[in-house]
C-alpha cells in the first residue's frame, strides 16, 4: 500500500448506511453497525456465492462416494458449511477493505466502506478478521483432516487475492479458485477422495467450472466500477474486456457447460443431471447475457442477478437428483 494515505472523502465520513436505518437491520446497536458493514451483512448475495460450491461438493461427494452419505449427515454438514461460509466471507471482506482502503476512497461505490471512511481502524479490522477465521475453522472442526488443509489453502488465497488487483487483470480467477476449493473440501467431507483416481478428472472439471462461474459473477458485478477503476488503476477482467463483455461471458458460459457435461459423462450421471445442471444452467446464463447485451439489465442489481441464481439452482438441482437416486434415505441410515 502507498506510504501516503488517500484522504477520506468528506461525504463518506458522515455516511449512514440506509439499510441499517430501517427494517430488520435497524435493531443492531449503532456501535456494531460498522463491523456488520465490514462483513457485508446487508449484502447476502456474497454468502450465496460462497456457499453454493459447498453444496455442489457435498452432493457430488455424497452421490459419487462408494460409502453413501446418509441424509442426516448431509444435512449436518450443510449446516456446518453455512457457518464456515459466513465467517470466512466476513474475514475476507474485512481483509479486502484493509488492503484496498486507498483504492476504495477513489471509487464512488466503495468510499463509504467502514475502513475507507474511517469508521473502523485498520487494526480493529484485522483483529475482527482474525476472529472470523477462528470461528470459521471451529465450524469445520468435526470434518476430516483434508478439510482443514483445504480450508487453510482457501485462507491463503483469500489473503493473496486483494493484492492481485494491483498486478494482473485476472484477479477474478484467484477469487474463483478461492471459492472453488470449497467444492473439493465438501467432497472430502462427504467421504469422497476427490483428487484421487478415478475422481481426479471429474473433480478438476467441476472445480474449474465453479471457478469460471465466480469469474462470470464478478465480471458482471464489477462492470459498475469500470470508470472509477480506470482512473484509479485497479485491474480486472471487467476493465480489460470492457468493450467485449458479452463475448467474454458467452465464452465462459460455453466452457462451463462443457465442463459440467464432461463430468456427467465421466461419472455416469443420469439424464436429469444433463437437463438441469447442463441445459438449465446454460439457458439461464445465456438469457442473462442477452439481457445485458440488449440493455434489459443495466446493473447487477436488476433482474440479471436472479438469472444467475437460477443458473446455480439448476446446477444444484441436477446434483440433488443424482443424490436422491443413489443415497439411502434417513430412515435407512
UniProtKB/Swiss-Prot annotation:
GO terms for biological process: terpenoid biosynthetic process; ubiquinone biosynthetic process. Pathway: Secondary metabolite biosynthesis; terpenoid biosynthesis. It is an enzyme of class 2 (transferase). The chain crosses the membrane at residues 74-94, 125-145, 147-164, 173-193, 201-221, 247-267, 272-292, 304-324. GO terms for molecular function: 4-hydroxybenzoate polyprenyltransferase activity. It catalyses: orsellinate + (2E,6E)-farnesyl diphosphate = ilicicolinate B + diphosphate. InterPro entries: Prenyltransferase, UbiA_prenyltransferase, UbiA_sf. It is found in: Membrane. The keyword NADP does not apply. It is a multi-pass membrane protein. Keywords: Magnesium, Membrane, Transferase, Transmembrane, Transmembrane helix. GO terms for cellular component: mitochondrial inner membrane. Its EC number is 2.5.1.-. Prenyltransferase; part of the cluster that mediates the biosynthesis of LL-Z1272-beta, also known as ilicicolin B, a prenylated aryl-aldehyde produced by several fungi and that serves as a key pathway intermediate for many fungal meroterpenoids. The first step in the pathway is performed by the non-reducing polyketide synthase stbA that produces orsellinic acid by condensing acetyl-CoA with 3 malonyl-CoA units. The prenyltransferase stbC then prenylates orsenilic acid into grifolic acid. Finally, grifolic acid is reduced to ilicicolin B by the NRPS-like protein stbB. This is Prenyltransferase stbC. The lineage of its organism: Eukaryota, Fungi, Dikarya, Ascomycota, Pezizomycotina.
Amino acid at each position: 500500500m502507498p506510504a501516503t494515505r488517500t484522504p477520506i472523502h468528506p461525504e463518506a465520513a458522515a455516511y449512514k448506511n440506509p439499510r441499517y436505518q430501517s427494517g430488520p437491520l435497524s435493531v443492531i446497536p449503532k456501535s456494531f453497525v460498522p463491523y456488520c458493514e465490514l462483513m457485508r451483512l446487508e449484502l447476502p448475495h456474497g454468502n450465496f456465492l460462497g456457499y453454493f460450491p459447498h453444496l455442489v461438493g457435498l452432493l457430488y461427494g455424497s452421490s459419487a462416494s462408494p460409502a453413501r452419505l446418509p441424509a442426516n449427515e448431509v444435512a449436518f454438514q450443510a449446516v456446518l458449511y453455512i457457518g464456515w461460509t459466513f465467517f470466512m466471507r466476513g474475514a475476507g471482506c474485512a481483509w479486502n477493505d484493509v488492503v484496498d482502503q486507498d483504492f476504495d476512497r477513489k471509487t464512488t461505490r466503495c468510499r463509504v466502506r467502514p475502513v475507507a471512511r474511517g469508521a473502523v481502524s485498520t487494526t480493529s479490522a484485522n483483529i475482527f478478521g482474525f476472529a472470523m477465521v477462528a470461528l470459521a475453522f471451529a465450524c469445520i472442526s468435526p470434518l476430516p483432516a483434508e478439510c482443514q488443509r483445504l480450508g487453510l489453502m482457501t485462507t491463503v488465497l483469500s489473503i493473496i487475492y486483494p493484492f492481485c488487483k494491483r498486478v494482473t487483470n485476472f484477479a477474478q480467477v484467484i477469487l474463483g479458485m478461492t471459492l472453488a476449493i470449497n467444492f473439493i473440501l465438501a467432497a472430502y467431507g462427504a467421504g469422497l477422495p476427490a483428487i484421487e483416481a478415478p475422481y481426479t478428472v471429474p473433480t478438476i472439471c467441476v472445480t474449474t467450472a465453479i471457478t469460471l462461474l465466480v469469474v462470470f459473477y464478478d465480471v458482471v458485478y464489477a462492470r459498475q466500477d469500470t470508470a472509477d477503476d480506470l482512473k484509479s488503476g485497479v485491474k480486472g477482467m471487467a476493465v480489460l474486456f470492457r468493450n467485449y463483455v458479452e463475448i467474454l461471458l458467452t465464452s465462459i458460459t460455453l466452457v462451463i457447460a462443457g465442463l459440467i457435461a464432461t463430468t456427467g459423462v465421466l461419472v455416469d450421471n443420469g439424464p436429469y443431471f444433463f437437463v438441469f445442471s447442463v441445459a438449465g444452467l446454460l439457458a439461464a446464463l445465456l438469457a442473462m447475457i442477452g439481457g445485458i447485451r440488449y440493455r434489459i439489465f443495466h446493473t447487477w442489481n436488476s433482474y440479471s442477478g436472479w438469472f444467475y441464481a437460477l443458473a446455480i439452482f439448476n446446477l444444484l438441482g441436477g446434483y440433488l437428483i443424482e443424490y436422491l437416486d443413489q443415497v439411502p434415505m434417513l430412515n435407512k441410515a
